Amino acid sequence: MYGVGAVKYKDFVVGYIEKNSFDMGGQKPESAKIEAEQVPGTPVLIILQSNGSIAPTFNVIQLNYENLHSLLGGTMHYKEEDSEKKTPIGWTAPTAAVLLTGPWEIALVSGQSSLIPNGTLLSNLGGKLTLTETAKIECTLEVAMPEDGSQPHGVFNTDSIPEEWKQYKLPPAESAAAASTNLAEE
């Protein structure tokens, strides 16, 4: 898996991602090592405490008013004569905390998509205002267990995304286990 093609929240495609800023993040699996006096230097039992997790981080550098509004909340402003609100002329920050929680898809150049049914975007306006760097929206995508208790994320070929994803769900683990059993029998 390599190369970020697009980051999507439901049907919204996030703007340009800063080169080399995307990191899968997260935590490594944790375990407790049980050691015995009779066996020096190596554990006699390893107890799994938690699976590993992902928490992607990335910087959005396409800072138009629509992206500021979509990723940070707040209010877009329009000229008085723009009654259809087609061309924003400004943006103001929100007065309350804003959470973008729900389904996310990270479409990769390599042909896969990472699907996250229940992700929460934490974002802030950051970066530098110089002639060699730009301001950016610094984002962390926290991955949580879906309300239905299904898998927190999965990776599929982009051209074969499961039907369940139309409801922003991943296929049940049982169907995946059945498919792998069928493959083993062939």
Can you annotate each of these PLM segments?
Residues 1-68, 118-136:
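Solvent-exposed edge beta-strands and adjacent loop segments
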Residues 7, 94, 98, 108, ...:
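Intrinsic disorder/low-complexity segments
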Residues 40-48, 85-94:
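Short secondary-structure capping micro-motifs at structural edges
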Residues 55-59, 103-105, 138-142:
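Beta-strand secondary-structure signal
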Residues 58-64, 108-112, 143-147:
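Beta-strand elements of well-folded, non-transmembrane domains
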Residues 63-93:
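Charged, amphipathic alpha-helical segments
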Residues 88-129:
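Acidic, glycine-rich flexible loop segments
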Residues 113-186:
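Mixed-charge, glycine-accented linear interaction segment located at domain edges/termini
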